[in-house]
Design a protein with these regions (language model features):
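Extreme N-terminal tail/first-helix region
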Residues: 1-16
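Left-handed beta-helix
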Residues: 14, 19-20, 25-26, 31-32, ...
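A short, polar/charged loop-to-alpha-helix boundary motif
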Residues: 49
């Protein structure tokens, strides 16, 4: 599910897969070949999240950042099941 937040809209820049019950909100950029799996939450409400090419965010992981912070995953990165990544 893609959700806007305060005028910020997630961007899918290249056929990224997002599972039906995953949430991608706000200032999030998904690069080509990236995947976001079941139950994962990517919250770009306070800062930007960039998911690099061919990276995957596995089931139930949460990515979020504080105001002014950012999370950037490079290419071919795996964020494991139920991980918490906070920038």
């Amino acid at each position: 599910m893609f959700l806007s937040f305060c005028g910020k809209v997630p961007r899918n820049e290249g056929a990224a897969f997002v599972a039906p019950n995953a949430t991608v909100q706000g200032d999030v950029i998904l690069k080509a070949g990236s995947t976001v799996w079941y139950g994962a939450v990517l919250r770009g409400d306070d800062g930007q999240l960039i998911i690099g090419e061919n990276s995957n965010v596995q089931d139930n992981a949460v990515l979020h950042c504080d105001v002014g912070g950012a999370v950037t995953l490079g290419r071919n990165v795996t964020v494991g099941h139920s991980a918490l990544v906070h920038g």
